[in-house]
A protein has these predicted regions:
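Catalytic core of carbohydrate-active enzymes
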Residues: 426, 447-455, 470, 477-487, ...
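Sec-dependent signal peptide cleavage junction
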Residues: 42-50
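A low-complexity, Ser/Thr/Gly/Pro-enriched, surface-exposed linker/loop concept
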Residues: 73-112
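Short, well-ordered beta-strand segments enriched in hydrophobic/aromatic residues
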Residues: 70, 78-80, 117-124, 595-598, ...
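Aromatic- and carboxylate-enriched substrate-binding clefts and catalytic-loop regions
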Residues: 156, 295-539, 574-578, 584, ...
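Bacterial N-terminal signal peptides
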Residues: 33-41
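Extracellular/luminal ectodomains and secreted, surface-exposed scaffolds of diverse proteins
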Residues: 105-108, 745-771
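Catalytic and substrate-binding clefts that recognize carbohydrates or anionic sugar/phosphate headgroups
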Residues: 109-263, 273, 279, 286-291, ...
């Protein structure tokens, strides 16, 4: 039966009555919340909001025609559903959790047997009574959507190949050598064709062979997996954003959930190696780190923490006789601790708490193993309350979910073990450790995994080719919102001895990645202790640079939460019409103002490695050469092992930490690097570092404005517990001529309050501790 549809406009409803009173109440609550957040944040644009989880669309956005249903989510995004059973999914699904968006303006009409839905960006045409199917031949005869792209009309229809898709990511880099994983990358949300499809149809396979499910009800407060209302239904989301890549990602996070901010400590240096360390050996590593003045924040206990090498839940007390004492000692030294898990084998009868768990599950006393069945809410409740909680009480800060063997569940057909483990572990921490930010370390589980940071990329091989492909892989993952990949810096496994230069280049690259973690397999010949290498001073400089850049990095993480644009992102986000932005795939933006072009080849006989670079249009500051250079060009340069090419956007202000050994302390002095070549601005974001308050406006921002020879530090906006009341600054004007004088707030400084380095051409201004609510103006005269 085809239902007649008259022309309508947004604000009218096709087939459901609007409950105006309820909607007005919703709007009042929303406006109050926005006003509250705006007051806290000072109206600076970084609006903190609780994560949206409202899957039922506004009825005004829905257009129904027979067995087809269309939901206009944004001017560029339309949901397409078709169900022969007349059953449409209104619950959250694995990728999409929120459809309650402001209704965009659109019109509908019937025309010559077609339903036409038009927004300001898209025109959808549906042949009334036509059947939409995923297995039909590619054709525009039943459904098509058209839009303008760079002055030409583009049409999509079911079955059309997206050959220009810019890709997303894949579950793991296990076995990566060079770019041998390229073919495994799943399609992303962005395409040079200007359109992409999110396919949440229940029969559609994800990259690991699993399918998407719905969320319905809860177990202990956690949204729980449920079967779709119609397994044969079509459930597509058409994204027609053209080359507005950042807008597409921002709107994706509106419907799929934001990228949560990880705890601050996670962005510091991790030590990790698959090796059976004893308590004394763990402590020796930490003491060596401190003796060598190496900044560090996280210690990983790989799988040998438990009695069975591969899997298990019980401490190996021959190696670690006092786990609580060891973890307390780590905490006392400023380190967080994570344990590795291979959970798929369940819980055997020789494990701690086995008898209690077996009894909780109502199993017979003859049962020797409680199987791993995380799709069972009863198992989740008992397993986590008995075993996971016991280890967390001992001080474990977060979990490394390393492998689930079976890609799909043995108990629920099509359920992806990776995605579901990530969902459960992350949300369990969110619900049960509310004084901390939830965090897990895991492999990619498919679209929607960005809600569960952070990513563990797996066991790659130690080769230059492997290193060379990882910049592309990491940046491209932002095309599905997965912004926190962590790699085994140095590679996981290797064929021969340690290569100090290759390790250095990996660490230099690692500075400009989301997670800064060294790791390797349990071959004793592989060394990951940087202080054991002949080039340790250079390796140490990479760690110091990482910690220096932390204010910039953490601010970029907040921006990712607000905008959906990840810390590492491809160049084509900012230069979508430049062919070089797509071709130079091992270059990427690290936040808004740093372009990174890592060295990924060995040095030649002259002790230098050549690299061909592209700089986009504009002016850039070449950090290696300490000079402003013009963009819109390709050039080749050579780099010693001491050098790694990265470029500041001209006019930027790059906020640095002073030298520090741990992120537990909040520095009372910051270094502001003022980049020549233009004007610009930056924002310094700060919060408590490991609470969920950042989602409710508990944070501060400080705006920094660079105009000509002047830097203005605007009064801080917002508040959070423990924030500094005053702060000193070291302001460095890079690569500039010596001024005649320097003033702060109109008062000329004496020579001791500022200096000039003739060799680096840097003006350094020392601003004493000043209340953070006071404006500071530093000017070169």
């Amino acid at each position: 039966m085809v239902r007649a549809i008259r022309p309508i406009f947004a604000g009218e409803n096709v087939e459901l009555r609007i409950r105006k009173e309820d909607m007005n109440n919703r709007k009042k609550i929303l406006l109050l919340a926005i006003a509250f957040v705006a007051a806290l944040s000072g109206g600076n644009g970084m609006r903190a909001q609780a994560a949206e989880w409202n899957p039922k669309a506004n009825p005004e956005a829905v257009v129904r025609s027979g067995y087809a249903r269309f939901t206009v989510l944004t001017p560029e995004m339309i949901r397409i559903q078709y169900s022969d059973r007349d059953q449409f999914e209104d619950r959250a699904t694995f990728a999409i959790v929120n459809r309650q968006l402001p209704v965009p303006s659109f019109t509908t009409e019937e025309r010559d047997g077609w339903l036409v839905v038009k927004t300001e960006a898209l025109t959808l045409q549906y042949k009334i009574g036509g059947r939409i199917a995923s297995d039909a031949a590619a054709s525009a005869d039943v459904l098509n959507i058209s839009f303008n792209l760079n002055g030409r009309r583009v049409m999509w229809y079911p079955g059309k190949d997206d050959a220009m898709n810019l890709k997303g990511t894949t579950r793991t880099l296990d076995g990566q050598i060079g770019d041998n994983k390229r073919a495994e990358l799943e399609n992303g949300l962005l395409s040079r064709a200007g359109w992409s499809i999110i396919d949440e149809s229940p029969r559609t396979k994800r990259g690991d062979g699993s399918t998407s499910f719905a969320f319905d009800g809860d177990v202990d407060g956690m949204p729980w997996v449920a079967e779709p209302v119609d397994k044969d239904a079509i459930d597509w989301y058409f994204l027609g954003y053209g080359h507005q890549y950042k807008k597409a990602l921002g709107d994706f996070t509106k419907v799929a959930g934001r990228q949560p901010m990880p705890p601050l400590y996670v962005l510091g240096y991790w030590y990790s190696k698959y090796q059976r360390y004893t308590s004394d050996e763990f402590m020796e590593i930490v003491n060596d780190v401190k003796r060598n003045q190496i900044p560090m924040d996280v210690m990983i206990f790989d799988m040998d923490w438990h009695t069975e090498g591969w899997t298990g839940w019980t401490w190996d007390r021959t190696a670690i006789p006092d786990p609580e004492g060891l973890i307390d000692w780590m905490h006392g030294n400023g380190l967080k601790v994570a344990l590795n898990l291979h959970p798929a084998d369940g819980v055997d009868d020789d494990e701690d708490y086995f008898q209690e768990l077996r009894s909780d599950m109502g199993l017979d006393s003859t049962v020797k193993r409680v199987p791993w069945n995380l799709s069972d809410g009863k198992f989740y409740h008992n397993m986590f309350n008995r075993i996971i909680r016991a280890r967390e009480r001992q001080g474990v800060d977060f979990w490394w979910i390393d492998w689930q063997q079976n890609l799909t569940s043995k108990y629920m057909d099509g359920l992806g073990e990776t995605f579901w483990c990530n969902h459960v572990f992350y949300n369990d921490m969110r619900l049960n450790r509310k004084d901390h930010r939830p965090l897990i370390f895991h492999r990619w589980g498919g679209l929607g995994s960005h809600r569960y940071p952070i990513g563990f990329s797996g066991d790659s091989f130690t080769t230059y080719g492997t290193l060379a492909w990882q910049p592309y892989f990491t940046a491209t993952a932002s095309n599905v919102g997965f912004g926190y990949w962590g790699h085994d810096l140095g590679g996981h496994q290797q064929y021969d001895g340690n290569n100090p230069e290759l390790y250095l280049r990996w660490m230099q690259y690692g500075v400009f990645t989301p997670i800064f973690r060294t790791h390797a397999t349990n071959w004793e010949g592989i060394e990951r202790r940087i202080w054991k290498y002949e080039n340790f001073p250079l390796l140490l400089e990479t760690v110091k640079l990482r910690y220096a850049l932390m204010p910039y990095i953490y601010t970029a993480c907040r921006q990712a939460y607000d905008t959906g644009v990840s810390l590492c992102r491809p160049l084509y986000y900012d230069w979508p019409e430049e062919s070089n932005a797509y071709q130079f795939e091992d270059e990427y933006m690290f936040g808004d103002d740093i372009l990174v072009a890592p060295v990924v080849t060995p040095t030649g006989d002259d002790g230098k490695a050549q690299r061909r670079n592209w700089l986009p249009e504009g002016r850039w500051f070449d950090v290696c050469r300490n000079t402003v250079v013009e963009g819109n060009r390709v050039f080749t340069d050579s780099y010693t092992q001491e050098e790694t090419p990265y470029f500041f956007r001209a006019g930027a202000v790059i906020v640095n930490n002073p030298p520090m050994l741990n992120l537990n302390t909040r520095p009372d002095r910051l270094i502001l690097k003022v980049v020549p070549g233009g004007n610009g601005s930056a924002t310094l974001y700060e919060d408590e570092g490991d609470t969920q308050g950042y989602q409710q406006g508990v944070f501060t921002t400080t705006r920094l404005v660079h105009e000509g020879n002047t830097l203005t530090i605007e009064p801080r906006q917002g508040q959070f517990p423990g924030m500094l009341q005053q702060r000193a600054y070291t302001v460095e004007f890079l690569a500039t001529d010596r001024p005649q004088a320097v003033s702060v707030n109109g008062k000329k400084l004496t020579n001791g309050a500022w200096g000039y380095n003739e060799q680096s051409r840097t003006v350094t201004v020392y601003v004493p501790a000043t209340p953070c609510e006071q404006r500071i103006k530093v000017e070169l005269l």
